[in-house]
Amino acid sequence: MSRNSAAGLENTLFQLKFTSKQLQKQANKASKEEKQETNKLKRALNENEDISRIYASNAIRKKNERLQLLKLASRVDSVASRVQTAVTMRQVSASMGQVCKGMDKALQNMNLQQITMIMDKFEQQFEDLDTSVNVYEDMGVNSDAMLVDNDKVDELMSKVADENGMELKQSAKLDNVPEIKAKEVNVDDEKEDKLAQRLRALRG
């Protein structure tokens, strides 16, 4: 392997490690912002339902963003580990080449041609990966992380309210919800708490 190829591989390893750290930092930032939105949700629960839902949606988006960032960081770490192995192989091969200049046959038995071919494939794959990682910020977080299910919003609002001994401030929609007759309620429904029933009625 040429010096340029070796330097390129080591540079890719550096870029991968740097990218992984940056993704971890962004994940930590998303985690802090998730907590901030959750705290805002706690304060708004008994004041305004619409605002509460906005804070709940924001918290869920930040949670999804954090998970996406951590998954991507894990993938980058995995590839960096393979690059590190490739760099080590190159260093070992170079050392042996300097020490055993006259041992051509021994080196041939190590199948250096195959090692070179594998390294060439490694470099090409990692150059492509490096390009993909560099455009990450232009792409933004995976679109799935930006979608928030209304059921998850309701679930988070209910959870926060329960944890803080609060009762959700309901909208005027509840005034028009028909009263559920006892005979229409099955055993499982009777076991559900009142807050969950109100949330279902609100979504209806």
From Swiss-Prot:
Renumbered residue ranges of the record's region Interaction with VSP4: 104-204
Record region (Interaction with VSP24): 1-103
Subcellular location: Endosome membrane; Endomembrane system
Coiled coil start-end: 9-56, 109-129
GO cellular component: cytoplasm; ESCRT III complex; late endosome; multivesicular body
Keywords: Coiled coil, Endosome, Membrane, Phosphoprotein, Protein transport, Transport
Membrane topology, as annotated: Peripheral membrane protein
Annotated Basic and acidic residues bias: 185-196
Keyword presence, Phosphoprotein: yes
Modified residues (Phosphoserine): 5
Family membership noted in the UniProt record: Belongs to the SNF7 family.
Primary role: Class E VPS protein implicated in concentration and sorting of cargo proteins of the multivesicular body (MVB) for incorporation into intralumenal vesicles. The lumenal sequestrated membrane proteins will be targeted into the vacuole after fusion of the endosome with the vacuole. Probably acts as a peripherally associated component of the ESCRT-III complex, which appears to be critical for late steps in MVB sorting, such as membrane invagination and final cargo sorting and recruits late-acting components of the sorting machinery.
Protein name: Vacuolar protein-sorting-associated protein 46
Species for this entry: Saccharomyces cerevisiae (strain ATCC 204508 / S288c)
Species lineage: Eukaryota, Fungi, Dikarya, Ascomycota, Saccharomycotina
